[in-house]
Amino acid sequence: MQNIPPQVQAMLGQLESYQQQLQLVIQQKQKVQADLNEAKKALEEIEALPDDAQVYKTVGTLIVKTTKEKALQELKEKVETLEVRLNALNRQEQKINEKVKELTQKIQAALRPPTAG
């Protein structure tokens, strides 16, 4: 087996780093997506309640009473924040994927035997 040039070893190390970053971003995306789905479901449930319904929310380890209007406002803000975060993570994932693809091509080109011309 031939030795891998130091330059290619460095690129392989960078590729591994990108792949770890990608895994982290994917995990974060899954968490944000789950939180977003939960917030949207809660929003639907509260919107379906009558205006005079008693609404409670959790604050740390406590459950406190709030108004439907205030709960709706807080949930809408939460959904908006989570959507922004999810979009940012999608862009980050796309950029890392592009870097992985580009670096993989460079590694393959560096390891390809020279062609006789």
UniProtKB/Swiss-Prot annotation:
Record keywords: Chaperone, Cytoplasm
A Pfam entry, by short name: Prefoldin_2
Subcellular compartments: Cytoplasm
S-S bridge residues: none
Alphabetical list of SUPFAM superfamilies matching this protein: Prefoldin
Any one cellular-component term (Gene Ontology): prefoldin complex
GO molecular function: protein folding chaperone; unfolded protein binding
Stated family: Belongs to the prefoldin subunit beta family.
Assembly information from the UniProt record: Heterohexamer of two alpha and four beta subunits.
Functional note: Molecular chaperone capable of stabilizing a range of proteins. Seems to fulfill an ATP-independent, HSP70-like function in archaeal de novo protein folding.
NCBIfam families found in the cross-reference section: gimC_beta (TIGR02338)
Protein known as: Prefoldin subunit beta
Organism whose genome encodes this protein: Pyrococcus abyssi (strain GE5 / Orsay)
Gene that encodes it: pfdB
